[in-house]
């Protein structure tokens, strides 16, 4: 599937080079994640993709839906994943990942859902209230709020012109960060708003009249996965519970002139009995 779209300048596929690069990273002890683009082709093969990654011992994955517009027509390209297809893909991928509550692979989206279910903030930017997780810095020093918005409209400045902290505090940067904070339209009453938080701005307004291109896919997936996410979260919460404190027991009673039960060899009235008789402040 990789070589269908990722072709080198000489017309050859790049899959062999990518796998060679991964082996070099492994040989050097460098940790890495795999970014997987879900397009019209790969969207039909979640099982084959999962099996390949598991067999290849690639355990840290991130799946990103391909949604591209044709610049000439404004319509969604033929190679983009379709909403229904993406929903099917996520549901089946989750079924494989779940593994009876003991996942063998880290998939970023699923891991974030578990984190949120145990009360931790999401790490994925699309699942956060504001789009301010990072800034993109290009080779020439140009800065942008997101790698999906590297364009003239959202150029925030250049590191050769002003320091990074000034760019991060710029009103334009803050505007982008806050654009998704207030629920709009049907999102206001959506049962999944607390998880989705209106999703990624990249997929908004791709099709006239539809706020988020992959909204229907996410709704279907959340409904499919929610019970098992809750099961994993409950197990993690149980593991985090501290061991109960041992029950408090009172010292055995003894007569005043008997040997003290603590084993000191002294009479009770001159040892623990005296302490017990002392008034407390």
Go through each PLM region and give its residues.
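Secondary-structure capping and boundary motifs in well-ordered enzyme cores
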Residues: 132-135, 252-254
């Amino acid at each position: 599937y990789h070589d269908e779209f990722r072709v080198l300048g000489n017309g050859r596929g790049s899959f062999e080079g990518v796998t060679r690069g991964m082996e070099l990273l492994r040989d050097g002890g460098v940790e890495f994640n795999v970014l997987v683009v879900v397009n019209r082709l790969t969207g039909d093969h979640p099982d084959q993709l999962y099996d390949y990654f598991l067999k290849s011992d690639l355990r840290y994955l991130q799946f990103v839906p391909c949604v591209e517009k044709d610049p000439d027509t404004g319509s969604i390209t033929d190679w983009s994943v379709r909403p229904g297809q993406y929903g099917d893909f996520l549901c089946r991928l989750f079924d494989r990942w779940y593994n009876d509550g003991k996942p063998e692979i880290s998939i970023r989206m699923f891991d974030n859902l578990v984190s949120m279910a145990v009360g931790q903030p999401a790490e994925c930017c699309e699942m956060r209230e504001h789009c301010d997780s990072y800034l993109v810095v290009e080779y020439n020093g140009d800065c942008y709020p997101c790698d999906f918005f590297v364009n003239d409209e959202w150029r925030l400045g250049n590191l050769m012109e002003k320091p990074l902290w000034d760019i991060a505090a710029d009103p334009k940067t803050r505007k982008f960060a806050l654009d998704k904070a207030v629920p709009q339209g049907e999102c206001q009453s959506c049962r999944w708003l607390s998880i989705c938080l209106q999703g990624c701005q990249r997929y908004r307004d791709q099709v006239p009249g539809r706020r988020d291109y992959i909204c229907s896919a996410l709704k279907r997936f959340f409904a499919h996965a929610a019970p098992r996410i809750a099961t994993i979260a409950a197990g993690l919460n149980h593991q985090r519970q501290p061991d109960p404190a041992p029950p408090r027991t009172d010292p055995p009673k003894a007569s005043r002139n008997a040997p003290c039960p603590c084993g000191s060899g002294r009479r009770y009235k001159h040892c623990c009995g005296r302490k017990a008789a002392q008034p407390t402040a």
